[in-house]
Amino acid sequence: MGSAPQQWPLSSGLVMQAPHICPDASHDTPAQAAAAVAPPDFKWPDGGVSRVPFRVFSDPAIYALEQEKIFRGPLWHYLCLETEVSQRGDIKTTWLGQTPIIVTRDQDGAVHAMVNRCAHKGALVCLKDRDNKPSLTCVYHAWNYGLDGQLKTVAFQDGIRGKGGMPADFDPARHRLEPLRVQVYCGMVFGTMSAQTPPLHDFLGDRTRSFMERNMGQPLKILGVHSQIIHNNWKLYAENVRDSYHATLLHTFYTTFKVNRLDMDGGIVLSDKKWHHISYSKRATLQVADEYQEAKVHAAQYGSDLEGPELLKTWEGFDDGITHSIQTVFPTLVMQLTLNSLAVRFVVPRGVDKTELFWIFLGYESDTPEQQKMRVMQGNLTGAAGLVALEDGCINSFVQRGTVGSPTHTAFIEMGGRLAESNESSRATEAAVRGFWHGYRDIMGF
């Protein structure tokens, strides 16, 4: 049972479909993660984070353990944008790993998050992607909850004509929706299911927060939303967005039209714990390097012009010269600013070899109509069918298919060295990928 997907209009008249959150038969359920009670018989290979065992992309036991250690563990996770619950009574459904989540704003203006699972029989309480109501009611037996998740009423709690009903000692206060801790920062709602998670300020660290405030520190508005299914383990996408080495090799549009190249000034900045990262480049500093020709990079062998060159026109929103940036927050959040295309991405595991990737294209409330139009146009660079990002939807599945039969083999991740460390002089490195695996090993106990 579900509702029709919501439509988000774009300023150009184009309509992008918002993701339909109500799960179907293809989505795994939280019960499938319950088997993870202890680490599997698994040992990380020698070589530290410069060697990654292919088994982590295809082993159901490891996937199940991730639900417990990562998605229900002591980490902060992106849940939604604050603007999606901007009004009192607003309701937004999302996912934290395989666990369905509700985010609300109550009548006092406070933001809450809770598991989308009725305390009675475990049914989903909210079925729509977004809604606005004074309370939450489970369609199965009409148990009603406040926007803070507290149980308010139980249908026929006292029975009918004095017969039946709940026992005399039934206490509604003991049957609320399971709450998450919530913090709102830079227009985003973060949640955690663990009481041991440190404050969000500490989890992010100074470097991460500073760059988040650069790109996300103004009031935001949504220009478009869509999602896609990619047929690979979620960690392959987490690697991909941290991999500055591949960006101008696989994505020929970047190289051909000089949007983002390794022969531009730029760098990689890792957070203090190595888990989060920022990759950036400065388009105006391009000095065409011989290495592109020597490496026979296909897109560097010829010159091309766009029939619509206005696609790549930009205005300077910041005074630091950065024109392309990818920022990640471990484990699943990505923030991008490609030219003037601002977006948030996040992934939801849908199985050991299937992932749903969500894209939310953004502007600032202060944008002029011309700036908003440009952001919408440049939204064509990324997304499921983007001029740049299209290839990522395929390449990760190639890795999934290539590695599934070789669980004892490992990936070789030594571009730029063997350590996870910042490098603000070159992006010809896999340092941020190693940083992800550093965090993964820490939290998983591998």
Tell what function each PLM region has.
Residues G2, Q6-K128, R181-V184:
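N-terminal pre-ligand scaffold of iron-sulfur
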Residues W8-C22, R105, A110, L180-F446:
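C-terminal catalytic domain of Rieske-type non-heme iron oxygenases
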Residues G73-E84, R161-M166, S325-P331:
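Short Pro/Gly-enriched beta-strand edge/turn motifs at strand-loop
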Residues Y78, E84-S86, F156, Y254-N260:
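Short, charge- and proline-biased low-complexity linear segments
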Residues G2, E84-A195, H201-D206:
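Rieske [2Fe-2S] iron-sulfur-binding domain
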